């Protein structure tokens, strides 16, 4: 995909601690979240159309996927509104990888949620 943004980061030592705005919190993927993830991606637009089956085929069923690396920002009412994934360099290497499939639903955009969920993904690689 030639139109994707690619950046390199030499170290994650200076990644800020995650400080979500009031009313939001962070959680990891749990088994069965494929529909939740697809809903966020579909509502955000521009990343394609996903079904639960496509999520399994392209994300959660892949060797580079690890459940601890798929993060969601939720409202305090447990509504998932943003996501990003720590996509491993290889199936067991946390030292390298990429921030994958970042999305925020339109109603919650403009609150820096993508910044904080990306920071959380970088913490996954660091920790």
PLM-predicted stretches and their roles:
Residues 10-14, 75-78, 107:
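Short loop segments at secondary-structure junctions
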Residues 101-104, 110-127:
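Conserved acetyl-CoA-binding loop-helix of GNAT-fold acetyltransferases
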Residues 25-37:
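A short beta-loop-alpha structural element at the N-terminal edge
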Residues 42-104:
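A conserved beta-strand-loop-helix scaffold within acyl/acetyltransferase catalytic domains
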Residues 9, 28-31, 75, 86-88:
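Active-site donor-binding loop signature of nucleotide-sugar glycosyltransferases
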Residues 1-22, 30:
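Acyl-donor-binding surface of acyltransferase catalytic domains
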Residues 5-6, 34, 38, 75, ...:
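Catalytic cores of nucleotide-enabled group-transfer and carboxylate-activating enzymes in metabolic
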Residues 21-24, 99:
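Short, solvent-exposed beta-strand edge segments and adjacent coil->beta transition regions
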């Amino acid at each position: 995909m030639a139109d994707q943004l690619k950046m390199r980061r030499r170290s994650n030592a200076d990644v800020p601690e995650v400080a979500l705005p009031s009313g939001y919190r962070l959680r990891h993927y749990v088994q069965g979240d494929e529909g939740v993830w697809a809903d966020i991606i579909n509502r955000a637009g521009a990343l394609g159309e996903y079904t639960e089956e496509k999520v399994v085929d392209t994300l959660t069923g892949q060797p580079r996927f690890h459940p601890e690396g798929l993060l969601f920002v939720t409202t305090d009412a447990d509504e998932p509104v943003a996501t990003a994934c720590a996509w491993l360099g290889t199936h067991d290497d946390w030292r390298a990888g990429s921030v994958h499939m970042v999305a925020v639903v339109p109603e919650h955009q403009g609150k820096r949620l993508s910044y904080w969920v990306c920071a959380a993904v970088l913490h996954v690689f660091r920790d």
